[in-house]
């Protein structure tokens, strides 16, 4: 797990991580039978990916981190918008 600036430990399992020269890509596989067309900002999957982005951002400070969900039943790739990630991180920080 990653140690957050406030001392809490973040644990989780990233399904796929691509460490590229100019960015970090984090991908999580989802097996929902009926994947949503859109994810609202307060969806638990957005919070999950925001947690990964936050931890990877601490580890790879000089590279942007992008997050996506791969729906295995569709198959479809959904990128999580940066503003949604920032909103979820702000929300997590506010509830601590």
Regions found by a protein language model. Name each.
Residues 1-96:
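Structural signature of nuclease core domains in nucleic-acid processing machines
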């Amino acid at each position: 797990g990653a140690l957050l600036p406030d001392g809490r430990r973040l644990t989780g399992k990233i399904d796929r991580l691509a460490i590229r020269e100019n960015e970090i890509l984090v991908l999580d596989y989802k097996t929902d039978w009926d994947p949503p067309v859109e994810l609202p900002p307060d969806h638990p999957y957005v919070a999950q990916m925001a947690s990964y982005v936050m931890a990877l951002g601490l580890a790879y400070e000089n590279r942007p981190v992008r997050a996506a969900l791969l729906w295995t039943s569709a198959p479809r790739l959904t990128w999580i918008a940066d503003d949604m990630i920032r909103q979820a991180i702000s929300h997590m920080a506010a509830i601590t």
